[in-house]
């Protein structure tokens, strides 16, 4: 039906007759001539309809926005004075010779010329995707997927599919369950990841595997999460963690170079402990210059329990953030930041303004200065390298609360005060994660997943002292987002059973849930390691947006609902009966 896309037309085609198909982006009547901005997925071109072309003019007079049309016309160069430098096709226009209405359009429930609510955009997603901004994002996603396949194919990886209907395994989130009609009372689980299957593929000898795959997690959502998401899943045999990081870093660097013409440079490597100590996060945004500085040793003897208490607690921490120019913050702003850290469990936010460093104590303004000696204050100023005009913000509590609260505050301050270098890229690898994390009851849980190998320990050594164990795991972080995570896997049945034991999974449960894996580990399993990227998150960063819904064609809301199709919906009673399922919905208590 067409010979060209609208957005591909240029001066080299001048004088040629082209056939275009697309939509009316805008129509204007000017002095007898009708101008149409015609749009398709590749862009917009201006069409001129002259009254001398009577048939085309009659059709053009009927056009309204979003009519679907077909056009036959001649490409001509615009006069220099009429070139539109804002359009990729701005040097040319099409003189209409034939015009056909393929389909008319009702008045749209969306206004493409102003901001629509996200609810409306999701309800009429098929219309929202017509907007050039959205179309460009989906096209960039397609290019990213194509690049990944090409890169991994060229590096000897095999694209192998794994099951979607599988067995529930503990991976940190709730499973989406699918009832079996044949095996009544039994359920499949939709995979949270292909983790075990890709490990089994290594045991099968396939050596290098990848898959761009849908995964499902029934968890509380946020801007960068969806109940169904797409993973670039990778697994290798006979490769070290350094080698896995090298090939996947190369993939991301080449992707950014090809799609954005940006050289990310070599990724620095940072241990987990350093990331938490300096930035309060295991996914630090290195575009932000603010850092956490520990001062517990300076305040452990002060007569101020808010500081000395955590400073003398082995699980406590006292740290500060020096904010350049922060002395200009008003009391109201400081109170707002105090309320912000309260969200993360902090009880307050002590502060110290350095109005004049040269003036000594007289140049210090702080509600806690009276509790601190001049030596302590000078020690804090020296350690933070504070200058006149700065403010120092304190966190004093359990170490995890200080890290989380000040880590979040660091990001907020960076954004609010313009300290974060927008428009730049700051990748890194975070490595050497703790193998386990402890809950409030003292129980250990796998920080990543229970198939991650410990670093430099035998099964006996791990069982003897599991709490301080470090895992052979690694995360790729870009601008404060974890875009990929992986590890060296356990390839020994004894070690895998030891990890299950530590996690409180007894022998019977091990056999029930993971018997197939433990059996497979007995048959010459090769050492293997892998990594999975979140494709949605990678594309979100490529597109410069902050919400993965912007880069998914048909996303769900934060309530895991599809506003367009009204999914999820109530099932047909006959279908439920065939599945031997009875649905009970708890009734809300009526107000008394």
Swiss-Prot record:
It comes from the Bacteria. GO terms for cellular component: cytoplasm. It is an enzyme of class 6 (ligase). InterPro entries: Aa-tRNA-synt_II, aa-tRNA-synth_II, aa-tRNA-synth_II/BPL/LPL, Asp-tRNA-ligase_1, Asp-tRNA-ligase_1_N, Asp/Asn-tRNA-synth_IIb, AspRS_core, GAD-like_sf. ATP binds at residues 217-219, 226, 482, 534-537. Gene3D superfamilies: Bira Bifunctional Protein, Domain 2, GAD-like domain, Nucleic acid-binding proteins. One of its GO terms (biological process) is aspartyl-tRNA aminoacylation. It is found in: Cytoplasm. The keyword Electron transport does not apply. Residues 195-198 are annotated as: Aspartate. The keyword Ribonucleoprotein does not apply. Its EC number is 6.1.1.12. Pfam families: GAD, tRNA-synt_2, tRNA_anti-codon. One of its GO terms (molecular function) is aspartate-tRNA ligase activity. L-aspartate binds at residues 171, 217, 448, 489. It catalyses: tRNA(Asp) + L-aspartate + ATP = L-aspartyl-tRNA(Asp) + AMP + diphosphate. Keywords: Aminoacyl-tRNA synthetase, ATP-binding, Cytoplasm, Ligase, Nucleotide-binding, Protein biosynthesis. Its main location: cytoplasm. Catalyzes the attachment of L-aspartate to tRNA(Asp) in a two-step reaction: L-aspartate is first activated by ATP to form Asp-AMP and then transferred to the acceptor end of tRNA(Asp). Homodimer. Belongs to the class-II aminoacyl-tRNA synthetase family. Type 1 subfamily. This is Aspartate--tRNA ligase. It comes from Vibrio vulnificus (strain YJ016). The gene is aspS.
